[in-house]
């Protein structure tokens, strides 16, 4: 299974592609889409949309994994991040990819074993899990971690969904007191 992971952002959107065969992971590609801040919002969103379409076309993933937007203390920032996420979702839908969403906590738990890991720790673990020569850039590492999360957790969720028990086990993120919990 080839997984495209995305860490959405209006200034920088990370992407990472891995091949997963059972528990064996192989690095395919990663990068960061840097959006010029001087562009108007619609053009910035188009940069994200066009670049992610191109990544999907070139790497031909089977599925996509996207980090769920966290609730920020600044509502304007949260809305802007949501719009960047929307551009990413449109690119994935246009590429006919199934999209699976994970919280930052779920991603860190899948990669590190704990949801309290620092960004640098996630970068180092991604490097180790994918046998990379160097440490990936922060946005790329987050996207690769999202892809790794889906490679580890996604097949289990799919099996539980087929059995009809996923909702009972609480394996999908849900809202509690206005916050996402996993």
Curated annotation (Swiss-Prot):
Mg(2+) 2 binds at residue 67. It catalyses: Endonucleolytic cleavage at a junction such as a reciprocal single-stranded crossover between two homologous DNA duplexes (Holliday junction). It is found in: Cytoplasm. Signal peptide: none annotated. Mg(2+) 1 binds at residues 7, 139. Its cofactor is Mg(2+). It holds the Pfam family RuvC. Its EC number is 3.1.21.10. Binds 2 Mg(2+) ion per subunit. It is an enzyme of class 3 (hydrolase). Gene3D superfamilies: Ribonuclease H-like superfamily/Ribonuclease H. Keywords: Cytoplasm, DNA damage, DNA recombination, DNA repair, DNA-binding, Endonuclease, Hydrolase, Magnesium, Metal-binding, Nuclease. One of its GO terms (biological process) is DNA recombination. Homodimer which binds Holliday junction (HJ) DNA. The HJ becomes 2-fold symmetrical on binding to RuvC with unstacked arms; it has a different conformation from HJ DNA in complex with RuvA. In the full resolvosome a probable DNA-RuvA(4)-RuvB(12)-RuvC(2) complex forms which resolves the HJ. This is Crossover junction endodeoxyribonuclease RuvC. It comes from Bordetella pertussis (strain Tohama I / ATCC BAA-589 / NCTC 13251). The lineage of its organism: Bacteria, Pseudomonadati, Pseudomonadota, Betaproteobacteria, Burkholderiales.
């Amino acid at each position: 299974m080839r997984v495209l992971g995305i860490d959405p952002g209006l200034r920088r959107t990370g992407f990472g592609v891995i091949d997963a065969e059972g528990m064996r992971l192989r690095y395919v590609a990663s990068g960061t889409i840097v959006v010029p801040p001087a562009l108007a919002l619609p053009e910035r969103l188009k940069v994200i949309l066009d670049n992610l379409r191109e990544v999907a076309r070139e790497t031909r993933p089977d599925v996509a994994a996207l980090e769920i937007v966290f609730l920020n203390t600044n509502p304007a920032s949260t809305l802007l991040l949501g719009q960047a996420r929307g551009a990413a979702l449109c690119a994935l839908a246009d590429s006919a990819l199934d999209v699976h969403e994970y919280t930052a906590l779920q991603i860190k738990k899948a990669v590190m074993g704990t949801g309290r890991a620092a960004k640098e720790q996630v970068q180092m673990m991604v490097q180790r899990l994918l046998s990379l020569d160097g440490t990936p850039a922060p946005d790329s590492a987050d996207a690769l971690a999202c892809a790794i999360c889906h490679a580890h957790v996604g097949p289990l969720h799919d099996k539980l969904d087929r059995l009809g028990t996923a909702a009972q086990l609480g394996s999908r993120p849900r809202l509690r007191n206005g916050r996402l919990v996993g």
